[in-house]
Amino acid sequence: MSRMDDKRFNCEKELTLAVIGGKWKMLILWHLGKEGTKRFNELKTLIPDITQKILVNQLRELEQDMIVHREVYPVVPPKVEYSLTPHGESLMPILEAMYEWGKGYMELIDIDKNVMKESL
């Protein structure tokens, strides 16, 4: 059962935004897509402003939406790794286009890059 089963969408774009929207999901996807498989604490280090609770929730939602794969290894201490599914990998061209658009828009509106927090 998908997390989207009980929701209604007017168009496909609305569904896409429901899956990747929010403050943190695109950053999580970006790091997994650009840097490959990561453990929880590695993601937490890459996204320092995210709380542990929010990171857990966002990863669970992305897993439920079949965008992120969670691999649990039967070792002590527990080892869990996160990676993109093929469906998650298919989002990378979209995220790359959004990155390029944002970079161009930042120049257009003349945002001081030193003031803007670098999260990528």
UniProtKB/Swiss-Prot annotation:
The lineage of its organism: Bacteria, Bacillati, Bacillota, Bacilli, Bacillales. Residues 11-110 form the HTH hxlR-type domain. Keywords: Activator, DNA-binding, Transcription, Transcription regulation. The keyword Transcription applies. Pfam families: HxlR. Positive regulator of hxlAB expression. This is HTH-type transcriptional activator HxlR. GO terms for molecular function: DNA binding.
